[in-house]
Design a protein with these regions (language model features):
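Solvent-exposed, non-transmembrane regions of integral membrane proteins
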Residues: 1-213
Length: 213
């Protein structure tokens, strides 16, 4: 319940303050990592206590294993993934992302260039609150140019880097994109999701499921 509440708060923060703020305040906070560790311990204890393997309850066993793998994927992302911020103004291009490590900020060079064509902010009718914001981009990579759009639920993938719409400049002439490069953590997490689907199917149609009993 507390973990779910944390995810809900993170979603709210991400919508109104940007992805970077949600990561700093919730996703990468010590309390959130503690909750994830306790969830892993809880999944293991439940699997042992109810003897899922001994009773051949493979569906539930796979589901619990998938949750553990998903959380391990999140930990791998935190430890080994590269996180940064790309700030760019309309009509400008850059290949530099700002990476913060403690109190120190360094700049890493991307193997391609990103150009901001236009930033668009949409507000709720009769309100100053943003309902969505979108970046229209040109990505110059390997001698070719890609025309891309990044907004709240549309992520850009280029050479292992993922770009998320995070924030924008007060004058609405510039965008802030959250950049993530995390192939290992992402693959572990996707494996966990695949196992989750398999586990749910086994729980429904397996030999010891309620439907087959």
């Amino acid at each position: 319940l507390l973990y779910g509440f944390g995810l809900a708060v993170a979603t709210f923060i991400e919508k109104y303050h940007g992805t970077a703020a949600a990561k700093a305040m919730i996703y990468y906070s010590p309390l959130f990592f503690l909750l994830q560790f306790l969830l892993v311990v809880n999944f293991i204890v439940i699997a042992v206590k109810y003897q899922y393997c001994k009773l051949h309850r493979w569906g539930l066993m796979v589901v619990h294993t998938s949750f553990i793998i998903i959380l391990l994927g999140a930990l791998t992302s935190f430890q080994f993934g590269e996180e940064g911020i790309l700030h760019i103004r309309e009509g400008e291009s850059t290949d530099q992302i700002a990476v913060r490590q403690g109190d120190l900020t360094t700049f890493h060079t991307l193997p391609f260039t990103v150009e901001l064509v236009k930033f668009t902010l949409t507000r709720y009718p009769g309100s100053s609150s943003p309902s969505s914001y979108e970046s229209e981009l040109l990505v110059h990579v390997d001698g070719k140019t890609r025309h891309e759009h990044v907004f709240m639920n549309n992520v850009l993938d280029v050479k292992g880097y993922r770009f998320f719409q995070a924030s924008y400049d007060p004058d609405e002439q510039g965008t802030v994109l959250s950049v993530n490069r995390d192939v290992a953590g992402r693959n572990i997490t996707y494996t966990g999701y695949l196992l989750l689907v398999i586990g749910l199917i086994l729980s429904l149609v397996g030999k010891n499921s309620r439907f087959m009993a």
